[in-house]
Amino acid sequence: STVHEILCKLSLEGDHSTPPSAYGSVKDALNIETAVKGVDEVTIVNILTNRQDIAFAYQRKELPSALKTPAQYDASELKGLGTDEDSLIEIICSRTNQELQEINRTDLEKDIISDTSGDFRKLMVALAKRAEDGSVIDYELIDQDARDLYDAGVKRWISIMTERSVCHLQKDKVLIRIMVSRSEVDMLSLYYYIQQDTK
């Protein structure tokens, strides 16, 4: 937010009794006077003159959340998720196996089970339990998985997407080539074909 940006830019160091020479204090004072006509100017002046205290209090309040490790931050985002499925998807799908272990898989699985339902719950729990990330990519297995996905439909798709490593699933050069080399008409045809095939 704008308030956050302003308060974070205020310096807590140095002598603030005299403004820097480039500081346009007269111009700023006139702008503030114009902006606050008809409001409680005394309160605004009192607040602005105590900006050092405000900045220090604000930064002290923000500091504990800034000191969290990425895993602690993710865990706090997932606690009491309720309906925030976007955060759940982003964290579960983009973190490595090691990062998910740092979040604490037991608590993570409990949170997922308590806050989701149906096939979405099954998919999220399976992703949270996925096998170790492998740095070795088996290209023959990738080709077989692609065929299996095409032939088997959704159930096999969930199995492959949750049991394979992130490296295994990221053959993005092929996708990028297809997206760049095909016209919009071809892409729409592919979309409709896939829609019909998955019904």
UniProtKB/Swiss-Prot annotation:
Modified residues (Phosphoserine): 25, 135
Residues with PTM N6-acetyllysine: 37, 171
Phosphotyrosine modification, residue list: 23, 150
Ranges for the Annexin repeats: 65-129, 140-199
Molecular function GO labels: calcium ion binding; calcium-dependent phospholipid binding; cytoskeletal protein binding; phosphatidylserine binding; phospholipase inhibitor activity
List of residues that carry N-acetylserine: 1
Main location: secreted
Glycyl lysine isopeptide (Lys-Gly) (interchain with G-Cter in SUMO1) crosslink site(s): 37
Top-rank taxon: Eukaryota
A GO BP annotation: positive regulation of receptor-mediated endocytosis involved in cholesterol transport
GO cellular component, one term: plasma membrane
Function per UniProt: Calcium-regulated membrane-binding protein whose affinity for calcium is greatly enhanced by anionic phospholipids. It binds two calcium ions with high affinity.
Name the UniProt record assigns to this protein: Annexin A2
Organism field: Mesocricetus auratus
